[in-house]
A protein has these predicted regions:
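Gly/Thr-rich phosphate-binding beta-strand-loop-beta motif of the actin/hexokinase/Hsp70
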Residues: 29-59, 163-171, 320-380, 558
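Conserved phosphate-binding/catalytic loops in two-lobed NTP-binding clefts
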Residues: 270-306, 310, 572-606
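Conserved phosphate-binding loops in N-terminal lobes of ATP-dependent enzymes
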Residues: 88-248
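Phosphate/ATP-binding catalytic cores across multiple sugar-kinase/actin-like superfamilies
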Residues: 15-30, 34, 208-237, 312-345, ...
Length: 609
């Protein structure tokens, strides 16, 4: 009886203190039609970002009705990712309270989240905190594995422990478990007698791209209709509907891989639409006629843009509109090289040849484009692009990170092990961190060691190099492993390493302290190594700079985070594919505050395109 009184007192107190706000539903009407929205996605090997562009019709004002895609953490919804977020993916079930309360209300799906994976900071945090060693709970980026359509051997796991069983649950949950099979294939694409839901989640690594795109779609759908977005971009009484999904791709992506990417995007749209109840669950989704059965219009997919060309458009648009006030003729005339003869039939100063190098996480892409003005004048000039040359290499920032780990981090650890008395330190390192080829608990622990120990230290070295004083010959990094780790590895990883160290140490030796391992890196030596071709990235940079030099370009644009490294900049200046004053580093490029990814009047480093 007393507990009932306490409960009623508590409820009455909450009722007095917390006023439930008025709930307002927004729908399209004749006076407030739905506003079409285009979503541009750049899914990279290392980082991902997106741009939302609303079409306000006659009220359009350049790029002012745009917003960066914001990914919200579902486990800590008060946190939003930075606009440029990691492409890491982790399986994690979205929970919105206790399910049986929803069932008692008469609806078993009161809250539906059409995805069972997390991306960005939440995925990284889940991976760093993972304690289980059965199977895998995620991957560094689905983009790397688009071609791998073979079901995995071990079941995928959710990365959080079940409090009752102390094991990680299998990575399958409502609503997606009823929309795909064990291999990750959507059921609506299969014959009726083969439509079995998920029992053993052995999704191929390629289908994880479908999962990632489902999560990004769900985040985008929530954002475009959020009160905050509608108030910021205008016309808050009008709902928003996705019209087009635009995927930017690296130049180096083969045609077959592009088609797989398109298929994954199509599957993600279908799964999200069916999970939300917007399209009949068992109906096919392939044709436009079948998609018209949807309650909410189905967006179209466009995949015509390559990443290097996107970087050129950022620069071209901003120069013409902002810096030259729409006077495109003056813009072209001021930058055209006087030492290059104009093409036949083209007046001098009415054409530009622009090259761009986009150094991403997984690919280095280059594009050379000829831009021609028509016969108009002032603000009525039309610019016609013609792609002259395009190339891409699957060598980029990830390879630079690997080089740093192999050149500086691993040798520092091996040296300290030898000083501690371990005679065959190289053999110990090989057994701990080498690839045995087996899929077992040791393999999972090796992956977690790389993720939780070596990669954060490697990133710390690159970040220090990026912000260093290039004119200081003594600049460098002098720290311990512990100094460079913002978050210590999990207990499982530490036990894995410490047991191996203790076993290899001579009897009576002092305890080996991993966090006290000293690291000394000279940034001048790193720059010299890049110039000498000792970094993997140097070879593709030599190749693309040679091509750019052959075309006598007017401007060279450098985009992507690795392009900020002093060694990379020194190498490009040394190769000098265009005069140094004609190289534009987009990480320092000035734009208006309203420009997407603008921070303090400059484009945020990384996804300059």
């Amino acid at each position: 009886w007393s507990s009932d009184v306490c409960s009623s007192d508590l409820l009455s107190m909450l009722g007095e203190q917390l006023t439930v706000p008025e709930v307002k539903f927004v729908t399209h009407t004749l006076s407030t039609p739905a506003i079409p929205v285009d979503l541009i996605l750049d899914v990279g090997n290392t980082h991902t970002c997106g741009v939302i562009i609303e079409d306000h019709g006659d009220a359009n004002d350049g790029l002012r009705q745009t917003a960066e895609l914001q990914v919200r953490s579902l486990s800590e919804p008060q946190f939003l990712n930075e606009p440029l977020f990691t492409s890491r993916l982790e399986f994690s079930e979205a929970r919105f309270g206790k399910q049986h309360f929803s069932v008692e209300s008469g609806r078993e799906d009161a809250f539906v989240w059409p995805s069972i994976v997390r991306v960005g900071d939440e995925a990284r945090k889940l991976a760093m905190q993972r304690l289980g060693t059965e199977g895998n709970s995620g991957i560094s980026s689905p983009r790397r594995y688009l071609w791998d359509e073979t079901p995995v051997v071990q079941d995928w796991r959710f990365s959080q422990m079940n409090s009752k069983t102390q094991r990680e649950p299998l990575a399958t949950a409502f609503p997606l478990m009823n929309l795909m099979n064990d291999d990750g294939e959507p059921l609506f694409t299969l014959p009726q007698d083969e439509r079995l839901p998920v029992f053993s989640p052995q999704y191929s690594r390629s289908t994880l791209m479908t999962h990632m795109l489902c999560e990004l779609l769900a985040q985008a759908l929530g954002q475009i209709n959020s009160v905050a977005t509608r108030l910021r971009l205008g016309f808050p009484a009008s709902p928003r509907q996705l019209r087009t999904l635009i995927l930017t791709l690296p130049s180096a992506m083969p045609k077959q891989e592009r088609e797989i990417f398109r298929r994954r995007m199509f599957e993600a749209i279908a799964i999200v639409w069916k999970a939300m109840g917007w399209h009949p669950q068992d109906e096919d989704f392939a044709s436009r006629k079948q998609q018209e059965k949807s309650v909410v219009p189905v967006p179209e997919i466009q995949m015509e843009w390559d990443e290097a060309s996107c970087g050129q458009l950022v620069w071209l648009y901003n120069e013409a509109i902002s810096h030259f006030g729409g006077q495109t003729e003056a813009f072209f005339a001021s930058l055209a090289r006087p030492d290059r003869a104009p093409e036949p039939g083209v007046q001098p100063g009415r054409a530009l040849r622009v090259a761009s190098i986009d150094i991403g996480g997984g690919t280095t892409d280059m594009a050379i484009t000829h831009y021609q003005l028509d016969d108009g004048s002032g603000n009525n000039v039309k610019i016609t692009p013609q792609l002259l040359f395009r190339e891409g290499f699957k060598v980029a920032g990830d390879d630079t990170l690997l080089d740093v780990i192999q050149r500086y981090v691993l040798p520092a650890l091996q040296t300290q092990l030898q000083k501690s008395g371990i005679a065959d330190a190289s053999q110990l390192m090989a057994s701990l961190f080498g690839d045995s080829g087996r899929i077992d608990t040791q393999a999972v622990l090796r992956q977690q060691t790389a993720l939780q120990l070596f990669m954060p230290i490697g990133h710390a070295i690159l970040a220090a190099w990026e912000s260093s004083d290039v004119d200081d010959p003594l600049a460098g990094l002098h720290a311990t492993f512990g100094d460079l780790l913002a978050q210590k590895p999990t207990r499982n990883v530490m036990n894995y390493l410490q047991q191996a160290f203790d076993h290899a140490l001579p009897a009576g030796s002092e305890h080996f302290d991993l966090f006290s391992v000293p690291l000394h890196v000279s940034f001048r030596e790193m720059r010299d190594a890049m110039l000498a071709g000792q970094f993997t990235l140097a070879a593709p940079l030599h190749a693309v700079c040679e091509a750019i030099s052959h075309y006598s370009c007017d401007i060279l644009l450098i985009t992507g985070r690795p392009g900020c490294l002093p060694g990379v900049q020194a190498l490009i200046r040394h190769l000098q594919p265009v005069p140094v004053n004609r190289i534009v580093w987009l990480d320092k490029y000035q734009v208006h505050e309203w420009y997407p990814f603008s921070q303090q009047g400059r484009i945020e480093i990384g996804r300059a395109h």
